[in-house]
Design a protein with these regions (language model features):
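Glycine-rich beta-strand-to-loop/alpha-helix junction loops that act as flexible
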Residues: 11-12, 89-92, 207, 321, ...
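Internal helix-turn-beta structural module
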Residues: 297, 301-321, 331-398
Length: 398
């Protein structure tokens, strides 16, 4: 087992999430979350050995300041000299990258080239990457793309039915997301079931505030619900998912809304929040629906119905169904949603085992269908940080 540790960074436009992992055991030795970056009240919270403490970043409230504070914290715990490499989550690698890669100047230029595909995320990833390069001098950096797993999708799945010059000129196509999670979960599902992943036709539902679903066959992505951006597909916490594109023209004409306003509404004010008028949090929606709140009940019903429909279509893309896999915060913990979704899927030969479904929560993996089901439904907790750490160690030669 390597004695060197892996630092994993995930930078947002105003946040930085980090973790120091032992790549061998998967143990997290230190984690941090910086928020309100680029604002006067920026801060970072560190967690070590179960203890949390907060550090003010107001003197240097940007991504570099956050990484500097992280370096000081590592020194305080004697961990700085044990870091062997740094892994970075990057949202979009477009069509340029079908796998994780060691960072050099050419890779940085490639990430810059993909900024139009992820205008909020890729610039932030670059800030974190440059900060890591300057503060952790001489250490290898590896980038792991959310999109790379989906580069195996066939043309019929990733192309939009629009004039093809838009694809050729602007890269207008479906890229998908959550790829690092899908890669980890596909491997874990095969291991858990004692099968070779190349022999499993899987439909994997990554359900969190952002939610998507992917068909996996021969260990590869065959289709996925998110598209050019993460707005396409399932009903999500605040995103609408699939919607008639002419909504833009309709609202511009009738509600006097701009493209930017409509885009923000569909991304940040729709989904469970928009339908219920209450919350984007699935736990709150479930609780209020149980109390009889009409908006919450409708939000839950729509979330489940859309998900069940997509599972059917992804079974087509996978060429059949051997395993339906639930992961992500909602997928791993909501026995209610899993049971109701499987209730739609009797035609695929799936029948819920209620006792097993209740047990498979709070980090517990498990098969949740009956022994006589034609396929299995299984809950597999995801671990994107560990997948990034594995890639980083491998590509850095650790």
């Amino acid at each position: 087992m390597s004695q060197k540790l892996i630092l994993v960074l995930n930078c947002g436009s105003s946040s930085l999430k980090g973790a120091v992992l032992d790549n061998g055991s998967g143990e997290v030795l230190l984690s941090c979350l910086a928020e309100k970056l680029n604002l006067p009240d920026a801060y970072i919270i560190f967690k070590v050995n179960g203890e949390k403490h907060k550090v003010d970043l107001s003197a240097h409230p940007d991504h570099t300041g956050a990484v500097e504070a992280l370096m000081e914290e590592l020194k305080a715990h004697g961990l700085d000299s044990r870091i062997g490499a740094i892994g970075h989550r990057v949202v979009s690698g477009g069509e340029l990258y079908s796998e994780s890669i060691l960072v050099d100047d050419e890779v940085i230029a490639g990430i810059e080239k993909c900024i139009p595909l992820a205008p909020l995320h890729n610039p932030a990833h670059l800030l974190g990457l440059r900060a890591a390069q300057s503060i952790f001098k001489g250490l290898p950096n590896v980038v792991v793309f959310d999109t790379s797993f989906h580069q195996t999708m066939p043309e019929v799945a990733y192309k939009y039915a629009v004039p093809q010059e838009l694809y050729e000129k602007y890269g207008l196509r479906r890229y998908g997301a959550h790829g690092t999670s899908y890669r980890f979960v596909a491997d874990e599902t095969a291991r858990f079931l004692g099968k070779d992943k190349k022999d499993l036709r899987m439909v994997i539902a990554h359900l969190g505030n952002g939610a998507s679903i992917t068909a996996v066959a021969n260990g590869e992505s065959r289709d996925t619900s998110m598209g050019l951006t993460p707005l396409e597909g399932l009903v999500m916490g605040t995103r609408s998912g699939d919607i008639d594109p002419s909504v833009f023209g309709f609202l511009a004409e009738n509600a006097n809304m701009t493209i930017a306003q409509i885009t923000e509404m569909l991304n940040k004010k729709s989904g469970l929040l928009g339908i219920s008028g209450l919350s984007n949090d699935c736990r709150t929606i479930e609780e209020e629906a149980a109390k009889g709140h009409k908006g919450a009940k409708l939000a839950l019903d729509m979330f489940i119905y859309r998900l069940a429909k997509y599972i059917g279509s992804m079974a087509v893309a996978a060429g059949g169904l051997d395993a339906l896999v639930f992961t992500g915060g909602i997928g791993e913990n909501s026995d209610i949603i899993r049971e109701r979704v499987i209730g739609y899927l009797g035609f695929l030969g799936l029948n819920i085992d209620q006792e097993a479904n209740l047990k498979a929560r709070f980090g517990n993996a498990g098969v949740i269908t009956t022994a006589d089901s034609k396929a299995v439904a299984v809950v597999i907790p995801t671990n994107e940080e560990l997948m990034i750490a594995h890639d980083t160690a491998r590509l850095s030669g650790l």
